């Protein structure tokens, strides 16, 4: 079983159009929507929602753009005086032990869920820059998913794998391997929360180890390594039609590759 998910619907019009195109003419079968951006186009999203075989979920975001709060809290630990988010994964990890920060975060996540529900019923939850994977934050997300009847929360266990391409052996890939180890270790704790709240999740993901290098090869070899014994594997990509963003444009082209679909189907029949 496999899910091929486009994160970041709503981050730009070019991303939105790439996601729509790849859902119609490619192998994309899922997306995650950022609702706190000026580019969250609900007309395009409705076309995706009209496809009964396409998953639409919520991409929780405290990394960039603005909070949905109408009244800003003075001296917020979550956003600046203009309501803008400027959080890195590292800064959020550090603040995730602060009760006041977690209370603010829960309120902002709740606002994003309720904004999504005005337009669609999310089938799953994940987050921008994997911030919901941080264990103290994951607990909040699972609690909210249960409260709002959202059945699936992404976890981030990725089996390290290698592909026959020397270009992939770079400093960036080594950094990504560290991310894989960190997120996979978090998943060991996070799956207990999944069980506690009776939620669903994936068994594996593909997309962290080769971030910025996702193409037909990395997708194929990633699924070959991670989708075994009927386990559910979710690939995450960030496609765009903006050719200046070469890595993301390459992901878009990969999603339109019919040969890749045939290869993935053969893997599932093993």
Question: What kind of feature is each model-predicted range?
Answer:
Residues 1-3, 9, 13-120, 124, ...:
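Terminal accessory/targeting
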Residues 127-129:
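Active-site histidine-anchored catalytic micro-motif
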